[in-house]
From Swiss-Prot:
Annotated gene: apt
Oligomer status and interactors: Homodimer.
Residue stretches in coiled coil: none
Subcellular localization, as worded in the UniProt entry: Cytoplasm
Entry protein name: Adenine phosphoribosyltransferase
Family: Belongs to the purine/pyrimidine phosphoribosyltransferase family.
EC number, UniProt record: 2.4.2.7
Swiss-Prot/TrEMBL catalytic activity: AMP + diphosphate = 5-phospho-alpha-D-ribose 1-diphosphate + adenine
InterPro entries documented for this protein: Ade_phspho_trans, PRibTrfase_dom, PRTase-like, UPRTase/APRTase
Cytoplasm listed as a keyword: yes
Length: 176
């Protein structure tokens, strides 16, 4: 199979009832373990994100780090981390957002983004869109021009894309 025709869905396994009953977890570790498939995935993501001409990629803790690091290298741009409380040194800016049951908070180092820098936010998966929407809001708080969001996997049935006011590139989509 050539890289152009490789079906990356074949390298992602679904694990039922994880992390709790009724959830089908899409495990990207099987994609990462296959060097050829991982290189194809990173090449396709690079090709998808390049037209946005980002100055910086913003990676959401923790699986967003896995895709953002190789893409930043491929694109020749910087990388910043969006992390949970207490994980970043120095002064941080935070954004708290609601979850189905409770809330969560993301932080960015206060000096990580220069106002007006073009930023693409990256995560492994887009489901309901709550974390990506919060990340976009946080990045705008520090002056970023958020030009897009990129994920490995999108679960279209959950409608997360509709919560975002930036273009979204998903490498793999599941409709159910």
């Amino acid at each position: 199979m050539t890289t152009a025709t490789m079906d990356l869905k074949q390298h992602i396994r679904g694990i039922p009832d994880f992390p709790k009953p009724g959830i089908l977890f899409y495990d990207i570790s099987t994609l990462m373990r296959n060097a050829d498939a991982w290189q194809v995935a990173m090449g396709r993501l690079t090709h998808a994100v390049a037209p946005w001409a980002p100055d910086m990629l913003a990676a959401i803790e923790s699986r967003g780090f896995l895709t953002a690091a190789p893409l930043a290298s491929n694109l020749g741009c910087g990388l910043v981390m969006l992390r949970k409380p207490g994980k970043l040194p120095g002064e941080t800016v935070s954004h708290t957002y609601d979850l189905e049951y409770g809330s969560d908070t993301l932080h960015i180092q206060a000096d990580a983004i220069r106002p007006g820098q073009r930023v693409v936010v990256m995560d492994d998966l887009l489901a309901t869109g709550g974390t990506l929407a919060a990340s976009v809001a946080l990045l705008r708080k520090v002056g970023a021009d958020v030009v897009g969001a990129s994920v490995l996997v999108e679960l279209r049935a959950l409608g997360g894309r509709q919560r975002l006011d930036v273009p979204v590139q998903a490498l793999i989509s599941y409709d159910d």
